[in-house]
Structure formats: structure tokens, C-alpha cells
A protein has these predicted regions:
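Extended, H/D-rich, highly charged conserved domains that either
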Residues: 1-49, 65, 69-83, 87
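SIR2/sirtuin-family catalytic core signature
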Residues: 1-2, 69-177
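A conserved mid-domain beta-alpha-beta active-site/ligand-binding segment of alpha/beta enzyme cores
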Residues: 49, 54-56
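Short, flexible loop segments at the rims of nucleotide/cofactor-binding pockets, characterized by
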Residues: 57-64
Length: 177
């Protein structure tokens, strides 16, 4: 049986749940993009118990499936179907847009494109320009069903919406198998 994991991508998670923090401010996001870029290119390193760890870049992981270890949520944008909900993809989410942009460029590279077989689906009602950008990034936009709650929505409206989105995701997963 396949498992479904939900990742909160806007934060940092170390070994302890108490270390989870949300990033605020452009300087944090710019720093995050630098780390994401290093991760994507295979130049990202980190230390665990005084041992230096190196991670293969996405191009190498595309060529060698045995390296696809899902070491980060970033990997999912290249190797798993991804369903995005609850984000408006404003400028604060530039890190996510950076990954989507790079992925779309790699989809136009014949060597990399045949290895990227996943889908990315966005739930929400983005502005017209953002919707066009997402579609250019090869992201499927589900803006009408289910309909997101409006500006004056109550908490229960959001709960109903998220449950409807999760049902839609479950349906899509069943259809794919």
C-alpha cells in the first residue's frame, strides 16, 4: 500500500519536532533559494554527528534512480506527484516558484525530460497572471473544483475545502493506478 505524506514546505525541520520554525522575511527566503539551488545542483553538504554528508544533485538523481532517496521535499517536485494547496504563491513563496521554474526548463531538455514523469497540481484561484505562469511551468491548475473559500470565510469553510481537496487528490491517485 502506498502512503500519502503531507509536507509543510515553508519551514525548517531538524531531528526534533520542537525545532520546526517558519521562515519570515525576504532575507530568509533568499538564503533558502541559495540552499535549494545548491541542493538541486548537488553542491549542498551538511553535517551529522561530525560526518560530512553530500547529496547528489537532481540531474544525477534523474540519471540514476537508485539515488532517488527523497532526502528532501525538493526531490518530490521531480520524482513524485505533488499536490499544492493552501498557498497563494505570492512573492514570499519565491523558493517554490524557483523550483517550478527550474523543473519546467528541465522538462524542455530532452535528456532530462524523459526522466521527469510526475505531475504537479495546484489547488486554488490564482490571479490570471499567476495561473498563466503556473501553466507555463507545467503545473495543472484546479481553480474551480473544489472552490476555495472566499475572503470572509470561517474556519469550518476552510476545513470543508481542504477535505474536498483531499478527496479530489485521493480520486486522482486512484485513477492513476
Amino acid at each position: 500500500r502506498r502512503s500519502l505524506r503531507i509536507w509543510n514546505i515553508h519551514g525548517t525541520y531538524n531531528e526534533k519536532p520542537s525545532s520546526f520554525t517558519i521562515q519570515y522575511g525576504y532575507e530568509h527566503y533568499c538564503g533558502c533559494i541559495g540552499k535549494i539551488d545548491s541542493y538541486l545542483k548537488g553542491t549542498y553538504t551538511y553535517w551529522v554527528q561530525k560526518q560530512k554528508k553530500e547529496i547528489a544533485g537532481i540531474p544525477e538523481k534523474l540519471r540514476k534512480p537508485q539515488l532517488q532517496l527523497e532526502e528532501s521535499w525538493i526531490d518530490l517536485f521531480f520524482f513524485s506527484n505533488v499536490y499544492i494547496m493552501g498557498l497563494n504563491l505570492s512573492s514570499e513563496e519565491i523558493d517554490l516558484l524557483y523550483i517550478l521554474n527550474l523543473r519546467s526548463r528541465w522538462l524542455r531538455d530532452s535528456k532530462k525530460a524523459r526522466c521527469i514523469q510526475n505531475r504537479i497540481v495546484f489547488y486554488g484561484q490564482p490571479a490570471k497572471a499567476m495561473k498563466a505562469l503556473l501553466e507555463e511551468f507545467d503545473v495543472e491548475v484546479c481553480s474551480s473544483s473544489p472552490t476555495p473559500p472566499g475572503k470572509n470565510a470561517k474556519g469550518t469553510d476552510y476545513e470543508k475545502y481542504y477535505r474536498a481537496v483531499l478527496r479530489d487528490i485521493q480520486y486522482r491517485i486512484k485513477q492513476a493506478h
